[in-house]
Amino acid sequence: MSSSRKQARLDAKTNIESLSVQPYPNSNKVYIEGSRPDIRVPMREISLADSLVGGTKESPIFEPNEPIQVYDTSGVYTDPSYDIDVYRGLPKLRQEWIEERNDTELLDGVSSVYSQERLADETLDELRYGNLPTIRRAKQGQCVTQLHYARQGIITPEMEYIAIRENMGRQKFADEQLNHQHPGHSFGANLPKEITPEFVRKEVAEGRAIIPSNINHPEAEPMIIGRNFLIKVNANIGNSSVSSSIEEEVEKLVWSTRWGGDTVMDLSTGRNIHETREWILRNSPVPIGTVPMYQALEKVNGVAENLNWEVMRDTLIEQAEQGVDYFTIHAGLLLRYVPMTAKRVTGIVSRGGSIIAKWCLAHHQESFLYTHFREICEICAKYDVALSLGDGLRPGSVADANDEAQFAELRTLGELTKVAWEYDVQVIIEGPGHVPMHMIKENMDEQLKHCHEAPFYTLGPLTTDIAPGYDHITSGIGAAMIGWYGCAMLCYVTPKEHLGLPNKDDVKTGLITYKLAAHAGDLAKGHPGAQIRDNALSKARFEFRWEDQFNLSLDPITAREYHDETLPQESGKVAHFCSMCGPKFCSMKISQEVREYAKDSEQVALDQAIEIKMIDDPLEGMRQKSEEFKASGSELYHPAVEAE
């Protein structure tokens, strides 16, 4: 290991061992209680300064602003009352709810052969997570999925928790200005004014939404993925054969949840995948997804042709018993679809897809994921693992977008969705990829048509291929669009996409970009209450409440840093201008003065006041600049002054 890699691992180890509560600036962790004391839904409440509404300089009159509550994925990592210890893990929020249902049993030990081998290997003791929980599984003849309960008409505590969470406390806002919202265009989505537990149950029962909630991951705070709810964002983490350690991945997990990751996928392909995943699960307040194929491939030394159902089955059980909430399974890639990719510019770009394609060609038969799909569903139903049906034939370039191979696989995913629903297994559908803007809506339309409104989960899509290093932007454009059209969850893309494994800063950049895309999609759909935060920030901006502007933003730290680059003094935080326009040309300052002028003069209408004000201030500034230009000799360019 290089010295830089050793240092990175040491730094990460130090960080996770000394994790302390790091709340956002001017924010408090608040909990909204449900119908029972153990339903306590976390929110981040942003406190705001008072607004100056009148009076004099000596005796100003202020009006209070209500604090704004926003969706919070950070778990106890931003709760000052909780003593964080990654070696102990997070509180088991859902354990009592799971026990009350009385449809699970505790196992004496792990069932997976591979898990048994890892536990017996004493050389792994230093890496192993020390506080392993007792494993649960459905009792014989029982199904323990949220879809099963929903279809039985049962509103679970998870469903009530989600209803409270999705409403984000907006019912308490009486301010007309904050509640103002433009009507959106939802493209057929059903967006109620208020999310109720019954609405959550119904959406899950119909297959339009999922609650990823493995019974062996009770630490996860319940959340929902569906187009009639807030658009969610997934963050990918995971080691590779050449980079990253357990400590770094746990650090990235905590970092991801802090910056808004609604779910996290562990895509580890390097050493000690089993141990890394255990550490992640025990410390994750959000659902964790995986691609089991990656670990199965490691078990056969990276030779795709040597994969088989027995190895895959053992891997699924291993991960389900650890607590993985959803599996990406590339079961829709059929043998006859592989030749359809022959004329593509970039062929098959999905790792899982390429593995399956190679196996199908080597054995000249359908993959074991397809032929054993019903057995996969039986395993998932015992632990409530949701299936994320992978798009192994997604386009890897805009040239390959919406081709025959992509849509052939999509139709098969729709067929498999119906099979999974026979077992009450929750399903989401994965989508592209690289798609130019004018071809994005067709993807959403085809998915809704062929996959029976199961939630769509896309990687971007990237709208152009010319910007390596900026693919968080090329994909953020497509993500906002497809989110508006009905996509339920967006998988983030970092600046390192196509270039390397992302570090902490890349993870943050990717998440902020995608939280922005998701929010833009919610606004465009007309999701109830989505505009409250925008309205609060706009009001703060107009009133020059700089600290409130920073704190209401998706990234308060960066917003404050950019402002302070040019106005670092504390006086800059109360100034009625920024460094872009200065005090004389600030449009908002002029607008405020216009309003005051019109209010003070009963004879002058607002439109007349604007004309008068435009003469009073900006034109005087223009005249001053004109005189300066003439005094300098009226020359456009002047010779550089050489230093003496």
From Swiss-Prot:
Pathway as given in its UniProt record: Cofactor biosynthesis; thiamine diphosphate biosynthesis
InterPro entries in alphabetical order: ThiC, ThiC-associated_dom, ThiC/Bza_core_dom, ThiC/BzaA/B
CC cofactor: [4Fe-4S] cluster
Signal peptide: none
Domain of life from the UniProt record: Bacteria
Biological processes annotated in GO: thiamine biosynthetic process; thiamine diphosphate biosynthetic process
Cofactor, how bound (note): Binds 1 [4Fe-4S] cluster per subunit. The cluster is coordinated with 3 cysteines and an exchangeable S-adenosyl-L-methionine.
Catalytic activity: 5-amino-1-(5-phospho-beta-D-ribosyl)imidazole + S-adenosyl-L-methionine = 4-amino-2-methyl-5-(phosphooxymethyl)pyrimidine + CO + 5'-deoxyadenosine + formate + L-methionine + 3 H(+)
PANTHER family according to UniProt: PHOSPHOMETHYLPYRIMIDINE SYNTHASE, CHLOROPLASTIC, THIAMINE BIOSYNTHESIS PROTEIN THIC
Quaternary structure and interacting proteins, as annotated: Homodimer.
Name the UniProt record assigns to this protein: Phosphomethylpyrimidine synthase
Originating organism: Aliivibrio fischeri (strain MJ11)
